[in-house]
Amino acid sequence: MRDFSGNHDWLSINTATVRKQSGAEVPLDRIIDQCAERGIRAISPWRDQVAAVGLDKVAKQLKAHGIGLSGYCRGGFFPAADAAGLKAALEDNRRAIDEAKTLDAPCLVLVVGALPGALESKAAYKDIARARSEVRDGIAASLEYAREVGMPLAIEPLHPMQAADRACINTLEHALDICDELDAGQSGMLGVALDIYHVWWDPKLQQQIARAGNAKHTRLLAYHVCDWLTPTRDLLSDRGMMGDGVVELKKIRGWVEDAGFAGFSEVEIFSNLDWWQRPGAETLDMCIERHCSAV
């Protein structure tokens, strides 16, 4: 396993981690500058943040600073109430693939979606099997275009408590089953984004990580870190800083690297009650410290 104790060369910042600083939204161009000031070599930006600044401007700023990407957030949300909605989702994913390519991302992360309308407490239907079928079909269609463009897709399984509203793929095993079905040739164009927050609890985690690495090209395309706090006060927005919770981060990173992953450890922390209320400099400096000591 790589030794992170001496530097933060393999630290990436998911820009959600510092999108709020001292309780206020901060634009992406400022976040990029803050990362550059600290020698952080990679980020994973969100589409809305990129759009607010401008895709071409962000691409130029990243190039000027010599900052790369560890992923691009996000595509997905494939299920819909009707044919028009399904078509619109596919068109939006095409745009996301194009944006990821412009930014030279190594992959587009897919948060696949679930019961359409559930995020607004107005689910169009309750049939989760239908949602999973629409997800499978949406990934298959998007993969065709992704192959043409040369942009790998990374399915991110989410915690089961988000199965109704955000993602109906909830285990690494399920995500890998879809990869094996749609990319039987193991081309490297379809894999997974492994987020500690969502999968740390899974009794099959070590086995499935090893399975992901047993492909011609490892299925592990992105690795997201944070920690699980006890108690967790908000399921979405109370992630912990690495080392503040109960996850065996170093053990899991060992499994991930044994499976062939040699990329960035991407810090993704949603923390409305804590880190988003602190100055961005404090949060980024702590990310560096904990990357070296806890990840």
Regions found by a protein language model. Give the residues of each.
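Active-site-proximal loop/turn and secondary-structure-junction residues that shape catalytic pockets
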Residues: 17-19, 47-51, 75-78, 112-116, ...
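Conserved beta-strand positions in the central sheet of alpha/beta enzyme cores
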Residues: 12, 44, 71-73, 109, ...
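Glycine-rich, proline-tolerant flexible connector loops at the mouths of alpha/beta enzymes
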Residues: 42-63, 115-119, 162-163
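N-terminal substrate-binding region of glycoside hydrolase catalytic domains
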Residues: 31-52, 73-76
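Active-site acidic/histidine proton-transfer and metal-coordination neighborhood
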Residues: 3-6, 83-191, 201, 287
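Active-site mouth loops of central-metabolism enzymes
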Residues: 11-27, 78-90, 125-131
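Histidine-acidic metal/acid-base catalytic patches
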Residues: 1-39, 104-105, 140, 169-194, ...
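A short acidic, helix-capping loop that chelates divalent metal ions and anchors anionic groups
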Residues: 77-82, 116-121, 161-165, 232-236, ...
